[in-house]
Amino acid sequence: MKKLVLLSALVLLALQVEAEPTPKTDEGTKTDEQPGKEDQVVSVSIEGQGDPAFQDAVLRDLKCFCRRKSCNWGEGIMGICKKRYGSPILCCR
């Protein structure tokens, strides 16, 4: 079951890379983001067959946020946010 979760995350990552390539930014024109606006907690669910107890154990301490450009240190890309408020990347830690 752990392999299924990992495989699902990798598939979502591959789809995201194909769907929206990240634009290259120049270091001089890079603007600082406002942390309060983009930090939105998102609930995550795993669909499909499997033991609900296992799914609860996997998601128990998982905290996810919709980010605009990239995940913060310690977070990983887990998919694409369904809300389209300028934050398409789903980052979880």
UniProtKB/Swiss-Prot annotation:
Propeptide: 20-58
One of the protein's GO biological processes: defense response to Gram-negative bacterium
Disulfide bonds: 64-92, 66-81, 71-91
Region forming the signal peptide: 1-19
Expression across tissues: Small intestine. Not present in heart, liver, spleen, kidney, large intestine and colon.
Reported induction: By hemorrhagic shock.
Membrane spanning residue stretches: none
Cellular localization per UniProt: Secreted
Listed InterPro entries: Alpha-defensin, Alpha-defensin_C, Alpha-defensin_N
Keywords attached to this entry: Antibiotic, Antimicrobial, Defensin, Disulfide bond, Secreted, Signal
A GO CC annotation given for this chain: extracellular space
Record PANTHER family: ALPHA-DEFENSIN 1, ALPHA-DEFENSIN 1-RELATED
Family: Belongs to the alpha-defensin family.
The name this protein goes by in its record: Defensin 5
